Amino acid sequence: MVAGKRTGAAKGSRHNKKYWRKGTNIDDIEDSIHIKSRQAATGGVISEMKDEDLFIVDRTATANKPVVPKLTKKQQAALEKITKNITQEHVTLPKPSTTSKILKKPAKLPRGNAILALKKGPKAAAPAAKKKNFDVWTTDLTPKIPKSKLENQEAAEHFLKVVKKKQPKTPGKSITSLLPAVQIAEGGASYNPESAEYQEYVAKIAGEEQKLIDHEAKIKAGIEPQWEKVTTEHERFLEMAEGLRIHPKYGKDDEEEEEAGNSEKSMKTGGEAEPKSQRVECDRMTKEQKKKKAKAQKLDKEEKRRLEEKAKEQDSHNVYRTKQLHKELDEEEKQRHEESEVRKKEKLINKLTKRQQLGKGKFVDAEDPFLLQEELTGNLRQLKPQGHVLDDRMKSLQRRNMLPIGGDKEKRRIKNRLKSKVVEKRSAKNIVKGSRVI
């Protein structure tokens, strides 16, 4: 313990009355006296001044005065009840017992400005803004980048990621066809169609059926011979049963004379008939024809030479028109490029709208279902079912190039003409000087 220094116990307790004068801070008292003297010198002590000297009441009328709505009967009765409770004398209530576990606070009644606000009535509600019709298909849902972020691409990317507006990268979808997945049937195929639509629909199906019948008749007519009569089995049997029959045009005597004449001729020639040699005649050209031919050949040669000279002269002149030639070539190249772009578009459209050969089979479209006039019932209970959903789905997938069509397997074709291969046998090799056995 250091000598000459008093401890806390020796100083005395701070809770006693003797410590009040010892523990007072003189600096706070001096500051308050200084502030009061300064206020008195400038205009007066603020704590001693009245409210009228300190504040000014603004009594000018406001431009937009709030509209005070009229109170209903219920609101007027409630307001009178509240004002009556306020004007009544205050009654002291006994202090609640501390033994109760739950202390309930009394409801606070409106006082002062709250009563004036109730007299004025509730504020007029602002007109609610009408909600705009939101259309998913026409509204542009792409995220908008603020103008402050447009200058920096990294800031824009970061903004979209933080705001959760940037969509994740997804693999591209391959579109196989632009055709609709489900084809809606025409009005004439209904169970209760209109007369005009039904007639048009049935006429179209009848026309397709007539085309098929005509095609089959054409094939059948092409198989049968046109100018010959095909003999049936019964006609062939009758012909064989008749035996040998001589035509009435030829008689027996004529045939015997012809046979005798032929035998005499063969005896004279010694049994061999020499064929007669026919004289071959060839037309010779006259002198005038030869002169005309030579003159025509000479004119052809001169014309050919003249055209060659003209082509050479034109090539020599092309040196001085290089700009025009370049321009013509550029225009030709531009036109060729435009034509190629058009071909590419047509090719893409055909690929997405037409059938492709995905299998060995051939695509045959399903027949359109139809009902006869006596089968039209007018209600679904008595309707005769036609077609099948699975058949429609199968045809739809094949039409949209999503399913191959099976067919006969292609047979392996063997070449008729085989390649010749030269093979030199060891026993037939030529032995020359310097050869050795391997």
UniProtKB/Swiss-Prot annotation:
Keywords of the record, alphabetical order, are: Nucleus, Ribosome biogenesis
Residues in the signal sequence: none
Q: Cite the record's Basic and acidic residues compositional bias ranges.
A: 265-288, 297-318, 325-346
Supply the name of the protein: Ribosome biogenesis protein NOP53
**What InterPro entries does the record point to?**
Nop53/GLTSCR2
Q: What family does this belong to?
A: Belongs to the NOP53 family.
What the entry lists under Pfam families is as follows:
Nop53
Where the protein is mainly located, per its record? Answer: nucleus
Q: Which GO terms describe its cellular component?
A: nucleolus; nucleoplasm
Biological process (GO), any one: positive regulation of cellular respiration
Superkingdom is: Eukaryota
Disordered: where is this region? Answer: 1-23, 247-346
Q: What role does it play?
A: May play a role in ribosome biogenesis, being required for integration of the 5S RNP into the ribosomal large subunit.
The subcellular location is: Nucleus, Nucleolus; Nucleus, Nucleoplasm
Q: What happens when the gene is disrupted?
A: RNAi-mediated inactivation of the gene induces lower oxygen consumption rate of the worms.
Biased composition, class Basic residues, residue ranges: 12-21
User: What species does this protein belong to?
Assistant: Caenorhabditis elegans
Molecular function (GO) terms listed?
Answer: 5S rRNA binding
